[in-house]
Amino acid sequence: MKSLEDLRLDDFRLELKGRSLVPIMQGGMGVNISTAEMAQAVAARGGIGHVSDAMVPDLADRLFGTGFTRMKALACKALERTTGEAGFHFPVEKIREAAKLYLGRVMEGRTGEGRIHVNIMEKLTMNASLETLRARLLGALDAGVDGISLSAGLHAGSFALMSGHPRFRDACLGVVVSSRRALNLFMRKSAKTGRL
């Protein structure tokens, strides 16, 4: 048995989807706190880097000059004159488009043997819970991410929302849970997709 001084990261490699990874996983903190560059650096060194999908339309606007949030602001202003903002729903196809653009660029910059995953929080809904979550999940798969970490919610239906996507069985999928009860609920609901 090796002494502590003789241990190296290579002694603890993880095999995941045919790749041998070092045991470094960087979390996906939202609104570009965990930047693409940070996740790419971790992946380049053989670990798993995460980005978050929180506020991806705004992030795409700031990084790529798109107009997702401007479009929303104009629509809200027009609606406010008549009924108020409460009735406005951001078009889910734009959410999927923004996710695919941002996450696709992150994946284009990946080098090395590591992986890039996206942290998707169930609780970010934009007034249309299931439709918004589905668009975010499918946008991530469209972009070619290596994996999705499901967090901030039970995600009982998330596998079903993605199950028709061509990459559903290719991407690594994981869930962050806070209790055995939450895990059991997730497992029971997700088992129907045949992906567990």
Question: What are these model-predicted stretches?
Answer:
Residues 1-196:
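Active-site entrance/lid segments in N-terminal catalytic domains of soluble metabolic enzymes
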